[in-house]
Each structure stands twice: as structure tokens, then as C-alpha cells.
Amino acid sequence: MSDALDDENVLCFRYKSYYIKDDGSRIDTLNEERIKHIVDFTLDKYLDATQNTPKFDNFENPVKEGFNSIFACESKEAAIEYYKEFKKQIEQKKLPIKIASIIAQTKVVMNKKLV
């Protein structure tokens, strides 16, 4: 993937990264409340960020079109917890979003070779 990006052989895409300043303290990345708030924030921003505004040919039938997104996690355990919370909130908010999970064993470092 990193070679394809460098060679410009992939479709153009946008990404948003959020970094937290490291103050030396340990963050419980699997904290249930933390995951809940991050998922809530992500879903609130998703439709605008992806220009994936729901369209309807009638009120009961949303037209499925738009863009996909990738939400990366630090571990398999984190991916599972985020997946469950996304499914729960998508259902509660009745959003026209589908979610899937892919767990890869290879660590990808942007603009460098695969490690």
C-alpha cells in the first residue's frame, strides 16, 4: 500500500488523523467509556466527512451510495470492542451505515516498507 501511494497508483482519498499529545501517562485504550465517546464522535462526523448524506427514493428506502471509510485500531482486542460499539450505536441512531471488520497480521508503516 505504501508503495502504491508513493507511486500514485491508487485512487485519491482524504484522511483525518487525530493525535493525542503524549504526557507520559498511560491511557486505558480499551476503556468502555472512551470507546463509546470516540465512536459517538466518529459517527457524528462521518456523513459530513464522507459526503455520504442519505438520499431516499421514498422515506422507507434509502438509496445506498457514497464513500467507504477505514477506522484503524491498535490491536485485535480494540478492533472487536470498537466493532461492537459501532454496531450498537449505528442501530440506536438508525444510521444508513454498514460496518465490517478486517484484522490483519501485518503492521503497515506509511511511506516506509512493510515491517
UniProtKB/Swiss-Prot annotation:
Q: What is this protein called?
A: Putative type I restriction enzyme MpnIIP endonuclease subunit middle part
User: Signal sequence span per UniProt?
Assistant: none
Which organism encodes this protein?
Mycoplasma pneumoniae (strain ATCC 29342 / M129 / Subtype 1) (Mycoplasmoides pneumoniae)
- Per the record, the coiled-coil ranges are none
Briefly, what is this protein's role?
The middle section of a putative type I restriction enzyme that if reconstituted might recognize 5'-GAN(7)TAY-3' and cleave a random distance away. Subunit R is required for both nuclease and ATPase activities, but not for modification.
Matches recorded under Pfam families: T1R_D3-like (PF22679)
Which superkingdom, per the lineage? Bacteria
